[in-house]
Amino acid sequence: MLNLFRGLALFLCVGTAWGIVLANQGDILTVRQFSKHVPGGDAGLHVAVMGTLTLVLGLAFSEARVFGSRLGFSRIVALMIAFATLEEWQQRLQPFRRFSFRDLLFSYLGIALAVLVFMLGRRLLARFRSPDRE
């Protein structure tokens, strides 16, 4: 089951990368049409995509081992912050895109919400797994 979930997480990463490539090549109209269906428009899309990626990658790979040590959720969050920053910054180099500090803040908000959901979920699981104290 974990391998299936990891495959889904990687598929989501590829889909996100494909959306970025389309936007960088000037197919921004497709992205804008899609963002009309997301509450909050483009800002909501940044929150949803970065939050979902962070949460799904964290759930799928936080216990994975890389070079003998556990990857951990905090490293995944650090990678997502770096990814969001670099993705927004690279838009300065693209003819059809522009850097937006607002978009970057909404990407960070999505990551922060994913961290909150992950931490609350872990606490709830720990509470339900521990024996009831009477």
Regions found by a protein language model. Name each.
Residues M1-R102, Y108, A112-E134:
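Bulky hydrophobic segments
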